[in-house]
Amino acid sequence: MNNNIRAKKSLGQNFLRDIHYLEKIADAAQVGLEDRVLEIGPGLGHLTGVLVKRAKKVLALELDERLIPLLQQEFGEGQSIEILHADALEYAYGSLPGKWKVVANLPYYISTPIIQKLIAHRGKFVSLTLMLQKEVAVRIASPPGNKDYGYLSVLVQLYAKPKIEFVVPPDAFTPQPEVDSAVVTLVIRDQPAVSLADENFFIRVVKAAFSQRRKTLRNALKQLEVNGEKMQQVLSKTGIDLGRRAETLSVEEFGRLADFLGS
């Protein structure tokens, strides 16, 4: 692989080269010979090379068109690998055949919208093993009552079981990012953690609750324009005190709250 390619700052590129961490990512994803792996952002192909040796099939989505011919030259095109010039935020994941494991070293500036997109198409995935900015990984895995617990925590934990696998220092990358990174695995749940009457309304409630996280639920949820009588019944009907703040509610409590307010 040509090592003279310079990382594009505009694409948030930081190329992971350290074979120790590349192997650990594949281990964390539990990539085996029967697995189809979707790699987002193969970059210079260092992780791709590890995945191709382990997986049945690797589909690599790369936004940087400079890298496509280099990746194709390195790996060729065959039954075991396909390299596409594609934007992970626009890709039609619904068109994927069967189930896939996602493995990705995500550009940090778009990691949250990509996670949301992948979660929206979770039916296509067994798991997501993602290299993220450490603080985002911590946020995803945080329990209720923690300062890092927020909308993304609830959304991910509703549909997946997150686990922080390990931290990766800046010097494992070229160029070095200014922050620590962490690999997190999200194992997609067969069913959401909570049975919901209306998943879209649940998401609206959680977004509203965390949009003003210093305020009580009573004040933060006013934007939903639920009638006052129903708001007064929340405590007696759900056991949830609207004097609490969003960060104290579990996913299950958000489910009860949303189902009642939306009924």
Stretches with model-predicted labels:
Residues M1-K207, S236, E247, R256-S263:
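Catalytic cores of RNA-modifying enzymes
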Residues I188, V206-S263:
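C-terminal lobe and adjacent flexible extensions of AdoMet/dcAdoMet transferase-like proteins
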